[in-house]
């Protein structure tokens, strides 16, 4: 997890990579702050979602980017935007003033994704978006991610340990082992057996299996 986190931080904020470049529209780019990354179109949905459970759906959608009308928040406008953007991803929010803690885990994930898209994400980093959810909620999130994928407007980095979810969503795969690239390839180059083996540890798993067999004999 630490290696994975460092790679994310190189992309989304001020961590400088030891080697290689981050290219945005073909231009080598570095970020001094997470805000710089966001302005350049890097949207991140964190594993903890960065949501405030006691605040409303709308306040979470606009957290830190509220729309003002004179000296007051323009809640009517923000409520309408929240409803519209959530509806685009298949979630009907009847009352955007309700605490976000009343929504399901899958709906909260969808809100975090919709928020990133609304505020201009060109690259969407999803950090284990299904890991803490039940099966039904996992399916909700996968449908949402697939909807975004089919827009063909946003690149998605989908970080997961679930081979089935990777197969459903991925067009191209990169397998990391302790911060190093173990393998990569397009969807048509990696079948399900190879996908499963690489995600399970590949050569290290085979070595462990051999060790167990030798121990048992």
Language model regions located:
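H-loop/switch region of ABC-family ATPase nucleotide-binding domains
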Residues: 160-161
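A short, surface-exposed alpha-helical micro-motif characterized by mixed small hydrophobic
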Residues: 166-168
């Amino acid at each position: 997890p630490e290696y994975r986190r460092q790679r994310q931080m190189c992309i989304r904020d001020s961590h400088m990579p030891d080697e290689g470049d981050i290219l945005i529209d073909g231009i080598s780019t570095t970020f001094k702050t997470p805000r710089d990354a966001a302005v350049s179109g890097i949207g991140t949905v964190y594993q903890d979602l960065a949501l405030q459970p006691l605040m409303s759906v709308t306040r979470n959608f606009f957290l830190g980017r509220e729309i003002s009308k004179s000296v007051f928040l323009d809640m009517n406008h923000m409520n309408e935007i929240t409803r519209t953007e959530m509806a685009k991803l298949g979630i009907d929010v009847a009352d955007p003033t309700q605490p976000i803690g009343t929504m399901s885990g899958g709906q909260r994930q969808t809100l975090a994704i919709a928020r990133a898209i609304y505020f201009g994400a060109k690259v969407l980093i999803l950090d284990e978006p299904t890991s803490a959810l039940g099966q039904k909620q996992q399916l909700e999130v996968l449908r949402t991610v697939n909807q975004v994928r089919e827009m063909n407007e946003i690149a998605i980095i989908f970080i997961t340990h679930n081979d089935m979810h990777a197969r459903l969503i991925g067009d191209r795969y990169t397998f990391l082992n302790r911060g190093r690239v173990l393998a990569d390839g397009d969807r048509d180059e990696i079948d399900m057996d190879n996908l499963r083996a690489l995600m399970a540890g590949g050569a290290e798993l085979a070595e462990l299996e051999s060790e167990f067999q030798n121990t048992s004999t």
